[in-house]
Amino acid sequence: MYKHIKHTFQLRFFKIEILHKKQILKRRPNHGGFMETIYLAGGCFWGVEKFFKQFRGVLFTEVGYANGDGKEANYEDLWKSGHAETVKIEYDPSIIDLEKLLEYYFMIIDPLSVNKQGPDAGRQYRTGIYYTSNDQVKSIDKVVKKVEDELASKLAVEVEPIRNYKRAEEYHQKYLDKHPTGYCHIRNNMFHLED
């Protein structure tokens, strides 16, 4: 009888421990725990979000507006607020590290183009890497330098801490999942690198 009780207790404790770890994972995304967050601007955010969702280790994506002049931002007024269309990416660094994410990022942007990606032009379509902790800067600098060396040119990609981020309107979230034939400046085959 005691053996059964002990076994039941261990199973419950194990379930509680797993639940507790999931809560920590959700609660502490930016504090060196199981999950880290980076914000990437790469032109129209619909395609950038769909591109990053495919990778193992990417736990969550969301589109929004970042690094503008004020805290308020919406799709219609981006040209006034100075925000960039940005994708928030939460990832497990034990599965995919920041350097790998940035290597993928540079596969889908033109890093020399100022305020333009594909046919989309305007300050809201600029490229940017917006970090959440100083620990990320070393990895960012390493990848940026590598790309600059390969291109023999200074990049037009902003590298700054994240500020004034606002989640985009619901109709923009997972847009290309809801509208598979919707517009995207990223080639369709780029959405299947993990297949």
Residue ranges with predicted function:
Residues 2-5, 9, 13-21, 25-195:
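Flexible coil/turn and secondary-structure edge motifs
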